[in-house]
Amino acid sequence: MLDTLRRTFIRSQAVLLLLAMQFVPALEGRDLSLDPQTEVAQPSSKTPASRLPEVHLDGTYFVRNGKRFLPVGAHWVPAKAAMEWPTEWDPKDIEADFAKMHELGFSIVRLDMLWAWFEPRPGDYNPTAFQQLDYLVSLAHKYQIYLHPSLFIGGEVGEAWWDVPWRLGRHPHADADMLRLESNLAAEFGRHYANESAIVAWDLTDEPPFWIVGDQTTDAMAINWTHLIVDGLRKYDKLHPIVVGTSGQEIDHGPFRADDISPFVDLFSVHPFTLYAPDLFPDALLSARGTYGAAFEIALSQGAGHPVMIHEMGASTAQFSPERVAAYDRAQMYSGLGAGSIGVDLWCYTDAAPEQFHKVPYLRTPQETGWGMTTWDRQDKPLAREFKKFSQTVSRLDLTGLAPAPAEIGIVIPDEWAKPHGDFSHFGLTGPASIPYLSTQDGDAMPGQRQPTFSNANQWLMSSALTAFILARQAGLKADFPREYGDWAKRPMLFMPSPITSTGDAFLAHVHSDFYEKARKYVESGGFLYASVASDGAIPGMASLFGARIVDRAPGSEVTLKFVEPFGDFKPGDTLHYSVPTASIESWGTLIEVSSAKVIAVDQDGRPALVTNTLGKGKTLLSAYPLEHYLASIPAVFDQPEPTQRIYAAFRDWAGIKAAFQSDQPSVEVSELQGDHRGYVILVNHSASAQNVTVSTILPVRNVSRVQADGSKPIEMEGRSWRIQIDPFDAAIVEWSK
């Protein structure tokens, strides 16, 4: 389950290849046909259940029997046998797990196809492994829980990696023979289960790059591997959607990020473990910023062009109270639903049994023992109860004709971040060149050099993007992440928080120079553009766009903005104060010289700090200080009223942008699944206090009702608004119709 970020907390310097000994030596020289110890039983009931209907994607949601639905469940690692369940096969115990999952409202379960068990020797497939999977398929039909198999599993829990014994040090994402064998095994899965309706989708693997080669995997390797494995499956299987179970690849700028694999898969996954990304989420587990993690990662991945599913999410009750874990997951499940998640698959179904504590990987990673929504002996923890209510609630949603509402704000993602490393297609070069272009920043293009990493620049970009995303939500606006060469001009507002406006060798953090020509045309045509700049900022043609230009750097350790003109709910004399996190050009602000712009606020030295400009049919707002960067590193910054969102709200009002639905409480996120005449408003309270919320709409809504696990309850409207009570880190789904 642990991704690269998580493993930095717990893994040892040596990879535990010796753990393969638990699986593989037992296979050598052994008859792999069924024996009494591995016998695959049939489900206990003699009454056949109805078969699960086939599932497909319609581009927005999963569909079965012609109706959209949200598959919800968790990852299954048995409590007693853990990752050794194929060799410690216990059909009765496994069926008891499926019965419990059915009781909790599971409609999907993700599970591991251990590579060393399915392919003990190169190209030699274990019939027992497939017979065991057949048994799991039969349980899926009986208990009406779709299977979501994850292929090529070596690692899943802690730092452990159960390797195939015949790899012999070869890179599984790069070695030609390994790629051939992996593609062939994928084809074998496709051949066996091409028409099996109990499988909801194939997951190519969990949290790639494979942990044993994580730091050695390039963009090209990830792209080629995904392409080949998908081709292997598609040789026989044309039915099932395909996903790669990635974790943190977008926020960490990993090689398996959504933009790299988009041409080959049907959907994306996110594993929003915010507690293991403290650089982005310097907060308590149960916090405002932390509970925006799922929605943020979903929006970031959606920008690459496919729907997104929450694959793994949660926290361990060995580290946090069960009640806080339940509230954390609850808020993120509903927030993710509003962001457009097409399913939820938590980590994980059960705690580990106490006997597992005495051996690796649980021996070395105590926190791994308590991630379940149930205890090891199938008793409900608070998360199980919250999950069951969530399952019952979303099962009542009619998603026909609905889609996540379009964003009001586009936070543009630089092409240098999105494109595969080594792609020169947007370099402005045409035709053949007698003297080839070579960039020293492309690293591996130089003999003997590896693909460079720019983790600091990526952190700078992601933290500011996350901050802008939350500020937009608090201002009642939806933000998404169109790519630099994408359709960003379709949004009424475009936001460019620093470092998107920066310059420098870490190109992935900022847009290309010619972007600003397009931005000016966008504004002239009626768009609304906000930007913040730091001392590292560089904007060609800045004066013509913002009515002001950079004249120098503005070093300092503290910044105070004082409003000198009314702006939104700001009055002259109002102030905002910020601490500058580092003495660097990434944190210092800028001295700007105003031409046509209007000064709205000045800094502590009376210099222009916020300026507005009108250009053609559109408007711009410029901050001379990187406000989003200032907030990004402050622990728990959103767990108390944070006034910076008022700047976003003021720009919204000045631009005349109105969201379809809006809350009067900045801490209550409002998102929408929207249709022509009906839809759902998802309200999530990201605070530790109960909120009595007034929700207003600009639509001619006639009826609203709250959708709950036990049914829908009408809500009385007052004109075009209504009031609703939402508990701390809780949520409400409100159905509306015109």
Where are these regions (language model features)?
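Extracellular ligand-binding/catalytic regions of CAZymes and related secreted enzymes
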Residues: 378-394, 432-433, 471, 598, ...
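Aromatic-rich peripheral "rim/lid" segments of glycoside hydrolase catalytic domains that contact
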Residues: 182, 349-408, 414-426
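Helical hinge/lid and interdomain linker segments adjacent to catalytic or ligand-binding clefts
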Residues: 454-543, 688, 713-728, 732-737
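Carbohydrate-binding surface patches
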Residues: 404-456, 461-466, 501-504, 518-520, ...
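The substrate-binding groove and active-site-proximal loops of carbohydrate-active enzymes
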Residues: 79-90, 114-131, 165-181, 205-222, ...
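Catalytic-core region of carbohydrate-active enzymes that cleave or remodel glycosidic bonds
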Residues: 226-241, 262-267, 271, 281-354, ...
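A glycine-rich, often tryptophan-bearing local segment used as a flexible ligand/cofactor-contacting loop or short
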Residues: 506-590, 596-602
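Active-site mouth of glycoside hydrolases
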Residues: 50-265, 350
